[in-house]
């Protein structure tokens, strides 16, 4: 069986504005990190090794990715992005993460205060079905949406 692949945009444009998201009910946030010692020593947010390299934000009416420390360039002004993110995180809206404990730990290590409820899709998946073998975003995407966010031979084999 061929597994359908999610067709992600391969080209993205740096946002040209910092939208005011303080009044929305829910905000999905995903941090892209460089965490070189995660497997051996644990989260870089705890051991002080690694970086947040980009921030993805989505609401019902907005989606954007804010690169701040990509090695290949194309980054936005980090201070401006983090100042905007501070306002977003301090708003009373619900913040939705996948593996919230990881991303929230990074945000707190960076000095951010997070107001509003924190929802975690990984925990929600475990509560919904405690007998699943995997709770990673790719596996859940396959289960609930019938598509993969990324493919590899290992991912294909584990889902068959």
Task: Annotate each PLM feature.
Residues 1-143:
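Conserved RNase H-like, two-metal-ion catalytic cores of nucleic-acid enzymes
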């Amino acid at each position: 069986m061929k597994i359908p692949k999610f067709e992600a945009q391969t080209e993205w444009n740096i946002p040209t504005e910092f939208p005011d998201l303080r009044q929305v009910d829910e905000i999905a946030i995903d941090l892209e990190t460089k965490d070189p010692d995660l497997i051996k020593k644990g989260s870089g947010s705890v051991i002080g090794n690694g970086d947040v390299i980009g921030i993805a934000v989505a609401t019902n009416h907005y989606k954007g990715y804010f690169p701040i420390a990509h090695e290949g360039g194309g980054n936005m002004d980090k201070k401006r992005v983090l100042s905007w993110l501070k306002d977003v995180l301090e708003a009373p809206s619900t913040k939705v993460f996948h593996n919230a404990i990881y991303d929230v730990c990074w945000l707190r290590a960076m000095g951010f205060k997070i107001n509003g409820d924190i929802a975690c899709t990984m925990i929600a998946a475990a509560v919904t079905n405690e007998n699943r073998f995997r709770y990673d975003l790719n596996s859940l995407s396959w289960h609930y949406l019938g598509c993969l966010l990324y493919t590899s031979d290992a991912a294909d084999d584990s889902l068959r």
